[in-house]
Amino acid sequence: MPTVFPDDSVGLVSPQTLHFNEPLELTSGKSLAEYDLVIETYGELNATQSNAVLICHALSGHHHAAGYHSVDERKPGWWDSCIGPGKPIDTRKFFVVALNNLGGCNGSSGPASINPATGKVYGADFPMVTVEDWVHSQARLADRLGIRQWAAVVGGSLGGMQALQWTISYPERVRHCLCIASAPKLSAQNIAFNEVARQATLSDPEFLGGYFQEQGVIPKRGLKLARMVGHITYLSDDAMGAKFGRVLKTEKLNYDLHSVEFQVESYLRYQGEEFSTRFDANTYLLMTKALDYFDPAAAHGDDLVRTLEGVEADFCLMSFTTDWRFSPARSREIVDALIAAKKNVSYLEIDAPQGHDAFLMPIPRYLQAFSGYMNRISV
């Protein structure tokens, strides 16, 4: 825990909760009559409102992207390596906005929050929201903050999908799009992994059809299994081999079916347990479905080039060589479509052994490329 914050940290930060009374029409045909969005901001908005950067989070992310909530906080925000003075998203230059998306479980309206119409927890009654719905809610957030146009919209993985959707839904409101370790839509294999994780959650006897909070229980076992499955896909075989190999946790093999004998088993159980204590099961189902549903080209005859013909932003795409969940080939699909649509695009494939989670890590070549692009953005 820091007693003095590093010079390149944004330091102590406080979340804000913004309430919206205007109904939000959703892709599903349902609507939210009112909702809350929790945000954090770093840096200062300039007089012309031209230096604003939106951070879009991935599946388990939230608004706390940088800095510390208290001097007792053990770890900084989830993208602290990239946000702060002198970092790729330099808060001396940019005004940075990070939020917890609708359907999340970190303060924004979602399954774990109170339904104002009933006075009870939403649970399974919270409507499905999509990437497009998130972008519409983020546009309202921009309006509330007095931001007509983002200097950049930035995100990795599911966050990259939101950044891409911004350029399609609101082309005139985005000058630069940074889409990192992402894809134009999920592959069948990716959807399959998400379905296995959902079934693990749904099969927990304490899930209770999504109304577990009313009964004062948590479907920890199912959520733990779901996270264990997901976490494997975020790491590369090389990274897991280097970190764990076949190292034993015990002194020797016990030759039974129940012992935790390998370090990798212990690690996965720890990750699953930790996740199950802080994340909402209904939110997990919603987030994985939002991933599955994302397919902006579907509305344009599955033609990604035609989908991107109307975008006005300049693009930066980055991928990682050992990411098999969102492989470099998926980023190149977007790059090729942008080139065919005659748009400005930069692309870097970074040699990194960490797999999909590399976009969250302080890899020198990644940070250098990230900084190089952000430094060229005029405000």
UniProtKB/Swiss-Prot annotation:
Keywords, comma-separated and alphabetical: Acyltransferase, Amino-acid biosynthesis, Cytoplasm, Methionine biosynthesis, Transferase
Coiled-coil region list: none
Residues of the AB hydrolase-1 domain: 51-360
Catalytic residues, chain numbering: 157, 323, 356
Catalysis: reaction(s): L-homoserine + succinyl-CoA = O-succinyl-L-homoserine + CoA
Feature type site, description Important for acyl-CoA specificity: 325
Transmembrane segments: none
Example of a GO MF term: homoserine O-acetyltransferase activity
InterPro entries the UniProt entry points to: AB_hydrolase_1 (IPR000073), AB_hydrolase_fold (IPR029058), HAT_MetX-like (IPR008220)
GO cellular component: cytoplasm
Protein's recorded name: Homoserine O-succinyltransferase
Organism listed in the record: Pseudomonas aeruginosa (strain LESB58)
Lineage of producing organism: Bacteria, Pseudomonadati, Pseudomonadota, Gammaproteobacteria, Pseudomonadales
